[in-house]
């Protein structure tokens, strides 16, 4: 069940370059759904709790996901405080 609306979803050039890999595309879609449903991925417990507070307080949300079959593939998903936009990016693009 969705915890929030993500607004316009964007991806960065680094993520777009990896979308040629169908497995990466599936990973990205599953990760986005997890983010919207409040599964914050590989965040520490403190950061997960901060996201739960951010849902109530209207602050920015961030999740981290690591691809199981390709551990070097990690994406960050950030939703703006006003929920107008969500960006999927590689950590190196932050």
Question: Where on the chain are the PLM-derived regions?
Answer:
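Compact soluble domain cores
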Residues: 1-63
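Short, compact, well-ordered microdomains
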Residues: 56-94
């Amino acid at each position: 069940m969705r915890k929030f609306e993500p607004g316009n979803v964007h991806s960065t050039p680094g993520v777009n370059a990896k979308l040629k890999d169908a497995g990466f595309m599936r990973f990205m879609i599953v990760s986005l759904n997890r983010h919207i449903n409040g599964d914050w991925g590989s965040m520490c417990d403190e950061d997960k709790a901060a996201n739960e507070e951010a849902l109530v307080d209207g602050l920015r949300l961030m999740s981290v996901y690591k691809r199981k079959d390709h551990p070097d593939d990690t994406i960050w998903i950030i939703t703006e405080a006003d929920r107008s936009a969500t960006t999927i990016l590689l950590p190196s693009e932050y």
